[in-house]
């Protein structure tokens, strides 16, 4: 079935950091693909803003080369590329110099803007320290209209205090309903499907609690190193970069109560309640229930790779590239159910998944049949493939057949072979529509930091040194110990 996307209203899409890595890899390809599918209005313009000394033609040449690198060849159409490039403008601005922003205003109010540009999307694809100054300069230049939106990339700050400072600075210019704090994990089809699976099927909800669920695992593993992001990453680490935002947002969708409606406020209200119910970790619990690691040299696939310290050119760096945490939620539904979270770079393979493992049957009923009865698991794969599968026990055909685990699976690519928008494509169109349902609200961000920041502080107080793990493995040995001491094991990975 061919699904035609609903067109969005004309807008000016302004990307601060328009020549950066995020714009080249994610934002501009996503906007091109929405143009390819006819979702961008004819008058929509895309304005790159950066310090680079480019004019419109130079920027278009740069973006053309970027599309060739980052868009699948069969999705590149020369006519669409030309149409897309014709939308582009470039403004050379020193983002730290407020007076430079007058040039942005000149482009926004230029005659080629037409009359349909009340909607202005300001995408801040730059360092969080610039969020406040950029918004302040936009406000001072009178460029923020009632229909404007601002998009903030994670992480929002380095800790609770800096997150609050950013939120205050941005909130002084934009109303909360205009602020879109993006987490691209929430735009993944399988993450959204989790809500439908939970709340659209009557059989699952009675099982979704501590009486039936043994534990939950949330994993985001990457096989790549830090690459060009070394300067940023060495000041952040895995907890700030991934766990405090991506993994906690996924945890919220797994653990939240049914919202009154699936709308912009109800879903976010329930996510906030989960974050506020996370049990704070004491110094002793942090020592016992968290693991940090840093990758050393090793073999990823067939490639010999160097260590993290070699990549960031700092032989003494103590930044964690791996973190695992055992967390608990203090409410009736989840009391006693551990949530195991882990994320790392230079792991054995790239995959992200949610594993909900159910408790075993109370009494084995088939002692005379060979084979094993594995626990039931609901596995939601987020990447590289998006899929949902239910693992259960079945008997092989024949009299005396063995017991073995089987899967009931929904693979999105197989079930829906037509191409669907990726996470950034979906979320960018939600921004233009003004729908913040899948974006983080201020209170969510600050609640997440309120839980995560003490962990960072306990590590610092204990002078925690990340354990080295070989690149191409599943992290430090301590990560396996964290879950195996509870009689459980990690799902996925090289094992």
UniProtKB/Swiss-Prot annotation:
UniProt cross-references to InterPro entries, sorted A to Z: G6P_DH (IPR001282), G6P_DH_AS (IPR019796), G6P_DH_C (IPR022675), G6P_DH_NAD-bd (IPR022674), NAD(P)-bd_dom_sf (IPR036291)
Pathway stated in the Swiss-Prot or TrEMBL entry: Carbohydrate degradation; pentose phosphate pathway; D-ribulose 5-phosphate from D-glucose 6-phosphate (oxidative stage): step 1/3
Binding site for NADP(+): 94-95, 154
Gene Ontology molecular function: glucose-6-phosphate dehydrogenase activity; NADP binding
This enzyme's EC code(s): 1.1.1.49
Catalytic reaction equation(s): D-glucose 6-phosphate + NADP(+) = 6-phospho-D-glucono-1,5-lactone + NADPH + H(+)
NCBIfam families (alphabetical): zwf
Protein name: Glucose-6-phosphate 1-dehydrogenase
């Amino acid at each position: 079935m061919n699904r035609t996307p609903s067109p969005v209203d004309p807008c000016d899409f302004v990307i601060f950091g328009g020549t950066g890595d995020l714009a080249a890899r994610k934002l501009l390809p996503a906007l091109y693909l929405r143009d390819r599918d006819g979702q961008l209005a004819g008058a929509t313009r895309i304005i790159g803003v950066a310090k680079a000394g480019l004019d419109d033609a130079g920027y278009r040449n740069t973006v053309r080369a970027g599309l060739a690198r980052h868009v699948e060849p069969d999705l590149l159409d020369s006519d669409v590329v030309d149409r897309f490039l014709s939308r582009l403008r470039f403004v050379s601005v020193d983002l730290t110099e407020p007076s430079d922003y007058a040039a942005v205003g000149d482009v926004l109010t230029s005659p080629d803007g037409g009359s349909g540009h009340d909607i202005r999307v300001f995408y801040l694809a730059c360092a969080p320290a610039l969020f406040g100054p950029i918004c302040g300069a936009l406000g001072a230049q009178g460029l923020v209209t009632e229909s404007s939106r601002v998009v903030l990339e994670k992480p929002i700050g380095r800790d609770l205090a800096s997150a609050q400072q950013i939120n205050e600075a941005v909130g002084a210019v934009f109303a909360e309903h205009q602020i879109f704090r993006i987490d691209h994990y929430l735009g993944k089809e399988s993450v959204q499907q989790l809500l439908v699976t939970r709340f659209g099927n009557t059989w699952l909800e009675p099982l979704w609690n501590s009486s039936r669920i043994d534990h939950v695992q949330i994993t985001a593993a990457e096989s790549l190193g830090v690459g060009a992001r070394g300067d940023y990453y060495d000041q952040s680490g895995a907890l700030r970069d991934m766990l405090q935002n991506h993994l906690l947002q996924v945890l919220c969708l797994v653990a939240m109560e049914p919202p009154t409606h699936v709308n912009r406020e109800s879903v976010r209200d329930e996510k906030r309640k989960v974050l506020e119910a996370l049990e704070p970790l004491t110094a002793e619990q942090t020592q016992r229930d968290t693991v940090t690691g840093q990758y050393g040299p090793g073999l990823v696939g067939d490639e010999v790779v160097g260590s993290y310290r070699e990549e960031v050119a700092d032989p003494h760096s103590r930044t964690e590239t791996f973190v695992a945490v055992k967390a608990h939620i203090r409410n009736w539904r989840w009391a006693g159910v551990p949530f195991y979270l882990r994320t790392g770079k230079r792991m054995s393979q790239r995959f992200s998944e949610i594993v909900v493992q159910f408790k075993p049957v109370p009494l084995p009923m088939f002692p005379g049949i060979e084979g094993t009865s594995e626990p039931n698991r609901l596995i939601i794969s987020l990447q590289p493939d998006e899929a949902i599968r239910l693992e259960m026990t079945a008997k092989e055909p024949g009299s005396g057949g063995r017991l073995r685990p089987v899967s009931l699976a929904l693979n999105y690519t197989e079930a829906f072979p037509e191409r669907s928008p990726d996470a950034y494509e979906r979320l960018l169109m939600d921004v233009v529509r003004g729908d913040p349902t899948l974006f983080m609200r201020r209170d969510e961000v600050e609640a997440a930091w309120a839980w995560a920041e003490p962990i960072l502080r306990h590590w610092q107080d204990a002078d925690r040194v990340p354990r080295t793990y070989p690149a191409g493995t599943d992290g430090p040995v301590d990560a396996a110990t964290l879950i195996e001491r509870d009689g459980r094991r990690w799902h996925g990975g090289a094992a």
